[in-house]
Amino acid sequence: MDTMTNSTIAQQFFDSYTRALLDRDAKAIAEHYAVPALIEFPDHPIAVSEVSQTEQFFSGAFGQYDGVSTTHATIRIVAETGHSIWADVTWTHDAGVPSERLLYQLVRSGSDWRIAVLTPLDT
């Protein structure tokens, strides 16, 4: 019987996601996303229907994190079900890059978890 809590699942998920982000590995980042998925940025929503869309999105965003070598994810679970975890995550970066706060809906995909919806929040 799987006894991992949703908090543990989210922590492990975001530890892996953080490594992919810091490595600037668009392919590894994309593997953390479900297909279909929704990246809901203001004035630039992306309805993801192919893994390559997520890879392209993040490849184009790496420049805004120039100089960042460490980041910390503070995770707060705001809702959970057997198939979804909603996590309010504040990212604190080094190198003077502003903090970010995002709401992630993680969904179960077989034995793994993936991001189905990503929405920015006010910090």
Please give the residue ranges for each predicted region:
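Hydrophobic alpha-helical segments typical of transmembrane helices
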Residues: 13, 25, 57-58, 73, ...
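Short secondary-structure boundary/capping segments
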Residues: 29, 76-78, 105
